[in-house]
Amino acid sequence: ALQGFDRPLQQELAQHTSIAQWEYRQTLDEPASLETALVVLHDYLKQHHQPIHLLGHSTAGLLGLLYARQHPERVKSLTLLSVGANPAMDWQAHYYAQRRLLPCDQRTILQRMVYGLLGCPPRDRTEKLARVLEQDLYQSLSPHHLLKTMSLSPIAVEVPLLVCGSVDDTVIDPNQLRNWQQYFLHQDSRLWVCPGGRYFFHYFYAHQVSEQIIKFWNKIFPLKALVTYQNVMEIGV
C-alpha cells in the first residue's frame, strides 16, 4: 500500500543502473509471516547467478536484513531506509501503541499518524493518506497487532550495510539510527541521516538519498563496471 512513496527514489536510481522491484502480497485471511516471505524471496533470488544490492524501507528493510543474515553470499550490499537498531519497529507499532493508550477510534488515530509520518499535508489529502495507511494495516508484513507489538534485538550482518533515516522521524529517531554503528561488521558499512522528510524521507529527498546510495555502491563495486543484468532489487511488502 505504501509503495507509491518509493517511486521517486526508484526513478532517481534507475538513471544509474537497472533496478528490479520484488513485492510480497498476501490475502486478508493470510497471517503475516516473515518466514514465508523469506522463502518466497529466496526462491526469486536463486534465479540470479551473482549477488545483488538489496534495498528496503521499513518492514521491507527488515525482510532484507533477515535475508542478508541467512544468505550473505547472495547479497552484495543492503540499504535500509527507516529501519532502527530494533529492526521490528515501524509505523504500525506506533499506531497500535496509540490505539491502546488513547480513547480515539481508528480513523482519528490514522489521521494523527498522517501528520506524524508526513508532516502537514494539504487537508484534502489527509483522508486519502489515512486510507492508504489503513490498507497497509491489513496487507503489510508488519509483525505487530493490537494486542502485542514485537521487538527484535539488533541484527548484525556480514555484508556492507547502509543505514539511512531522517533527523525528524518520530518512529525511527536518530538514537535508533546511531545505535546501528556498534553492529557494523563490514568496513564499508555506514550511517547517513537525512536533514528532513520524517518516516518517508526517501520520498521528499529522493535525489539526496539516491546520491548517498550511489556513493555507497560505487565504493563497494563501481557501477560503471557492472554487467547488464538486474543489479539492484528493491523489496516491497
Where are these regions (language model features)?
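Active-site loop/oxyanion-hole signature of alpha/beta-hydrolase fold enzymes
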Residues: 7-11, 17-53
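Gly/Ala-rich beta-loop-alpha elbow adjacent to hydrolase catalytic centers
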Residues: 55-64
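Flexible "cap/lid" loop of the alpha/beta hydrolase fold
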Residues: 69-105
